[in-house]
């Protein structure tokens, strides 16, 4: 009866863990469509890959079929995620991810396995150490999203914190916690307590910041106020610097009157369009008069 219950809980845990593994699929589909990783980070996926690799090694030592199956799938899928990330990441992010994968997923994992296989002869001791290391990195998997949590709090947006990943991560932590208790495997049960706490924290943040309109309205109002103040300051500076609206004085008025009374010079002819032809009176001179007649002269 107990074995059947343990197996049933393990199956449920595998299903939920599989959903957790598939939760970032929309995220990486978005990366593929936009050909850009935007603000997404590779650290959680590299840590998740290392955790799956360590648990796979632990499952091989303990002959736990349920842990073996789900962590094999986890290694494959997390590797695909990192491959997609490397294809579309900027140069700096790609270089950082490559260094991280080489140092952590290759060098560190190889060092752990080699040390346990070569230096620890007792099988029970090897299982205990492998379980402790696996539990430590399982905690790192749950702590890795803290960078995303900080980003959510700073930007007041859950755009880069996938909801379904947080949701299924929380459920998976609950199920694997009970699986560890039933199996009396505290290396499995202990890290999932922290996983439950961080999962609940992410769910709370999602509820608080899920309304982008409300958050953007506050941000837009503050931004609009800053723009308004800045515009007023710029307007005041323009008014002070512009000679067209400089304060008037007596000398300026006199100069303006003299300039208005001065006739147009040949160098500046008046614009014909500005003349009202209806108000112009043309002075036409009269026709020339004939010269007066000479008086008649009588001839004697």
UniProtKB/Swiss-Prot annotation:
Ranges in the topological domain labelled Extracellular: 1-4, 62-67, 121-128, 184-185
Membrane topology per record: Multi-pass membrane protein
Entry-linked Pfam families: MtN3_slv
Transmembrane segments: 5-25, 39-61, 68-88, 100-120, 129-149, 163-183, 186-206
Cytoplasmic side stretches: 26-38, 89-99, 150-162, 207-300
Domain annotation MtN3/slv: ranges: 8-92, 131-213
Compositional bias of kind Basic and acidic residues: 269-280
Subcellular location: Cell membrane
Compositional bias of kind Pro residues: 284-294
GO MF term list: sugar transmembrane transporter activity
Positions of the UniProt region annotated as Disordered: 256-300
Keywords, comma-separated and alphabetical: Cell membrane, Membrane, Repeat, Sugar transport, Transmembrane, Transmembrane helix, Transport
Subunit structure: Forms homooligomers and/or heterooligomers.
Family classification: Belongs to the SWEET sugar transporter family.
Function: Mediates both low-affinity uptake and efflux of sugar across the plasma membrane.
Name the record gives this protein: Bidirectional sugar transporter SWEET12
Organism, scientific name: Oryza sativa subsp. indica
């Amino acid at each position: 009866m107990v074995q059947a219950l343990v197996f049933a809980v393990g199956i449920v845990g595998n299903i939920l863990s599989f959903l957790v593994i598939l939760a970032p699929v929309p995220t990486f589909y978005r990366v593929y469509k936009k050909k850009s990783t935007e603000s997404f980070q590779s650290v959680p996926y590299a840590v998740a890959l290392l955790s799956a690799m360590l648990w796979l090694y632990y499952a091989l030592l303990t002959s736990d079929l349920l842990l073996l199956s789900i962590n094999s799938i986890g290694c494959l899928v997390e590797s695909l995620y990192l491959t997609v990330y490397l294809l579309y990441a900027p140069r700096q992010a790609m270089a950082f991810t490559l260094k991280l994968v080489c140092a952590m997923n290759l060098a560190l994992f190889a060092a752990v396995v080699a040390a346990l296989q070569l230096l620890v002869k007792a099988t029970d001791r090897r299982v205990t150490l492998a379980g402790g290391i696996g539990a430590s990195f399982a905690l790192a998997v749950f702590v890795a999203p803290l960078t995303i949590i900080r980003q959510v709090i700073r930007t007041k947006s859950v755009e880069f914190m996938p909801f379904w990943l947080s949701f299924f991560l929380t459920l998976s932590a609950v199920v694997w916690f009970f699986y560890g208790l039933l199996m009396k495997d505290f290396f499995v049960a202990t890290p999932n307590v922290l996983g439950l706490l961080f999962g609940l924290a992410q769910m709370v943040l999602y509820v608080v910041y899920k309304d982008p309109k409300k958050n953007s309205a506050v941000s837009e109002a503050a931004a609009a106020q800053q723009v308004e103040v800045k515009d007023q300051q710029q307007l005041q500076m323009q008014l002070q610097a512009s000679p067209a609206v400089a304060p008037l004085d007596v000398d300026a008025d006199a100069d303006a009157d003299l300039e208005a009374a001065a006739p147009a010079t040949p160098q500046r002819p008046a614009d014909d369009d500005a003349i009202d032809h209806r108000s112009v009176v043309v002075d036409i001179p009269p026709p020339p008069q004939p010269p007066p007649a000479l008086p008649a002269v009588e001839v004697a």
